[in-house]
């Protein structure tokens, strides 16, 4: 479908001031949608930028509070065509380890409140940003969408993974019991302009960029052999909207085709910044799964564009960081 699928439609985006949510807001506004941008945490610069867009209305909402969510939907719902759910408590491996209870509690309450309101207020469709961390890791076999916890349910005390698993199960049950038109997107590691560069909590790419740009060595948790698939945030947004446009699959992996080790990634980051390689391994720190290889067959069928190569995406992200760092 063409961009006019979104022109004149009203789309509610949660986590609208966050990294992924703000990119959805910008792209939807550019494509002619009326955007209801829900947020909880103040981010003044992004807030001012989005408020200046022609078709964006910012609404502060505590998604963990059922009455607050219902109040927002009651006020906004008569015109909502689509919900894009990006809000989630997230962070790097250390953050997830230390705050698992808080993450699980926050994320499961948020998705429960949201899906109940989508049902009760008759919203036409919802896409949920899930996670590829749901899959059991294999260094050689790419995870297909049907290879998730339904095939291999396993115990974990990782509150983030548990919250995403709960969210997917609840979404499926809403689809089956209430007929909710819900889509689940499972991204690889998302990166790009606008990400948070807090090294104590941030994702791997912004953390590496911040340290390398400051002339510090990059610390890699583990031996650096763990591999990941990365996806530029703009590609994630475009692929998710294409999934809604086509309605082709209920779940879809979204990632770039390149699978790189964390050690290779560190070298790429140093190179795009023009820094000499200064890398230190710390085997005592948590590393997550050794591999997270994703099958992208569904994504290849759905999208109508070529995802950005990792090197080009890193160069763009590095330029953005150097312009906006403090």
From Swiss-Prot:
One Pfam short name: Epimerase
Keyword NAD: yes
BP term (GO), one: antibiotic biosynthetic process
Residues binding NAD(+): 15-21, 129-132, 164, 187-190
GO molecular function: oxidoreductase activity
EC number assigned by the record: 1.1.1.364
InterPro entries cross-referenced by the UniProt entry: Epimerase_deHydtase (IPR001509), NAD(P)-bd_dom_sf (IPR036291)
UniProt keywords, alphabetically: Antibiotic biosynthesis, Carbohydrate metabolism, NAD, Oxidoreductase
Site entry (Lowers pKa of active site Tyr), positions: 164
Chemical reaction(s) catalysed: dTDP-6-deoxy-alpha-D-allose + NAD(+) = dTDP-4-dehydro-6-deoxy-alpha-D-allose + NADH + H(+); dTDP-6-deoxy-alpha-D-allose + NADP(+) = dTDP-4-dehydro-6-deoxy-alpha-D-allose + NADPH + H(+)
Tagged with keyword Oxidoreductase: yes
Active site: 160 (proton donor/acceptor)
The organism's place on the tree of life at top rank: Bacteria
Family per record: Belongs to the NAD(P)-dependent epimerase/dehydratase family.
Role: Cannot directly reduce dTDP-4-dehydro-6-deoxyglucose, and thus acts after the epimerization step catalyzed by GerF.
Protein name per Swiss-Prot or TrEMBL: dTDP-4-dehydro-6-deoxy-D-allose reductase
Organism whose genome encodes this protein: Streptomyces sp
């Amino acid at each position: 479908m063409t961009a006019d699928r979104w022109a004149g439609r009203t789309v509610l985006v949660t986590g609208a001031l966050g990294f992924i949510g703000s990119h959805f807001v910008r792209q939807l506004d550019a494509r002619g949608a009326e955007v209801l941008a829900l947020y909880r945490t103040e981010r003044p610069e992004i807030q001012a930028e989005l408020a200046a867009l022609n078709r964006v209305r910012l609404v502060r909402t505590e998604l963990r509070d059922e009455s607050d969510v219902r109040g927002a939907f009651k006020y906004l719902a008569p015109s909502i065509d689509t919900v894009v759910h990006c809000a989630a408590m997230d962070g790097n491996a250390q953050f997830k380890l230390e705050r698992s209870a808080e993450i699980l509690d926050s994320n499961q309450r948020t998705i429960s409140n949201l899906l109940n309101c989508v049902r009760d207020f008759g919203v036409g469709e919802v896409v949920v940003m899930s996670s590829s961390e749901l899959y059991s890791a294999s260094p050689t076999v790419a995870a297909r969408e049907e290879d998730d916890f339904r095939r291999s349910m396993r115990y974990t005390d990782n509150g983030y993974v548990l919250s995403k698993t709960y969210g997917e199960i609840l979404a499926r049950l809403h689809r089956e019991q209430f007929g909710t038109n819900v889509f689940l997107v499972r991204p690889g590691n998302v990166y790009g302009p606008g990400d948070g560069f807090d090294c104590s909590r941030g994702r791997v790419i912004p953390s590496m960029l911040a340290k390398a740009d400051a002339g510090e060595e990059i610390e890699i948790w583990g031996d650096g052999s763990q591999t990941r698939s990365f996806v530029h945030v703009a590609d994630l947004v475009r692929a998710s909207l294409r999934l809604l446009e086509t309605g082709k699959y209920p779940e879809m992996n979204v990632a770039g085709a390149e699978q790189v080790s964390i050690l290779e990634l560190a070298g790429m980051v140093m190179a795009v910044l023009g820094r000499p390689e200064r890398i230190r391994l710390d085997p005592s720190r948590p590393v997550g799964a050794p591999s997270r290889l994703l099958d992208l067959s569904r994504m290849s069928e759905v999208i109508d564009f070529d995802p950005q190569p990792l090197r080009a995406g890193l160069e763009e992200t590095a330029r953005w960081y150097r312009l906006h760092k403090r």
